Amino acid sequence: MDGRAAPTPGGTADGARGGAGDGAADAAGGGAVDGVVGGTAAEAVTMGKLAEDLANRKADARGMGGEDLVARQHELGKLTVRERVDVLFDPGTFTETGLLAQAADTPQTQGRRTWADGVVTGTGKIHGRMAALIAYDFTVLAGSMGVHGERKAARMRELAVRHGHPVIYLLDSAGGRVNEAVGAFGGTGDVFREMSQMSGVVPQVGAVLGHCSAGTGYVPALCDFVPMVKGTSSMALAGIHLVRAATGEELTEEDMGGSAVHAKISGVADREAADDADCLRMVREYLSFMPCRYGDPLPVRPVSDPPERRSERLYEIVPANLRKAYDMRGVITELVDDGAFFPIKPDWAKALITGFARFAGRPAGVVASQPLVRAGAISVDEADKAAKFINICDAFDIPLVFLVDVPGFVVGREVEHRGILRHGAKFLHNISCATVPKVTVILRKAYGAGYYVMGGRQYGADYIVGWPTAEISIMGPEGAVNILFRRQLAAAAPGEAREALRKELIGKVRAQIDPYLTAKQALIDDIIDPAETRVHIIKGLEISQGKRITAPARKRGVIPV
């Protein structure tokens, strides 16, 4: 014997259970099937009532702040948070968590509807791929950030990193909930640390669909992509009432931080949307270019646009005369799959174009000069715009395509006072450290440090080609002549004689920066027919697809911010 008690009739092996207990269960009509004891008819009724009560609570919770506040949301031209969820996600895919959460008990919340504690959290699918959601509900306590709601949000961030889901914030919030934070502020603020540590791990999107100030103000600023709705959204470090109390300024939300301010002046917003639905469409489209998390494959789409397609229209769009301007957006439309381009910050720092497109179905980030604005010269804002865009592409292994027609950086007292060296260094730093495939096409001018930052050969270009009009030089021929031959020009007779000499010297200098001389020195991979630019971009991306770079050991680089 092994010391264990033998089973007894109607009992258990150790005799501690059974007998009368089992008989009582049988007498009650429950019986036992495979060791599972069933409930009574009365218990079934009770369970049904509990289920009904649960359903009623959830239905009430989905009513948000109540009919009056929902109507007010619609009067302002805004969708409710739950209508936004329906627009954002593929139909029937959203799973909510924390619906039954409510605000902490305070005198200010007594008798008020505080379902979900003013923030809807959960996961759903966008184009068939999972994404996490943290969406503030302005109908519940003005969407303010409460202790319980932020606990829900923190869990969504944790799970998003664990499961590899992009995080989407739908922002319509008065900010931190003052009545809960007073006396407990030392335990708040985790959101900004968590978002910073998540950066580059999963994509983070902050869609501003209403108020976004104070506590929520930094949320979009820490996101990768920030669309705002025209006319109904605002974003600021402090609300207008706090600003009035602190500075005496009388401002409207729109004047201080409306979509036009951040899309055209500050550069915090990436796009300006017509309405909520348009904004949410932008979120879906942005994520269509992104992997779900770092290391995942990029989403490839089937495409009918032939990779070998030529475009003779480029002969018409880009003038051979380097002094004539043109719209680079027309060039981009000719080169990308089906002419579809998703611009980033199109209304800010306009001398440089950034955005996403596909080549042969594969996502790529496009950085392009815009000769229509200052001939494409790079200033402070353009440097910042490009630096962040390159950062995002590099973080998620999205290849970069550079379309170059740049006379260099803007010079002068104004830009020096604004810190052009510091901001330009940011651009240089990020292009230098980016390890993704880089394909560079030089259409016309590639002068000075502008050439370096726009995917220059020494900055990791994996495939660099030029048109017959390409010029790579420390500066343009005109500038070089003014410096190199200033005494000779000064000695020439003013008027026609001096201009004739200048023209002759410019011709000599231009002959020294002929693209075929550059090709002769093996400083460029090829001179190409402009009509075959798309073909070469796709070839370059295919060639460099397996790129791997091992960086020197270090903790992190010191970005010149």
How should each PLM-predicted stretch be described?
Residues 2-27, 31-561:
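Ligand-binding clefts of soluble mixed alpha/beta catalytic domains
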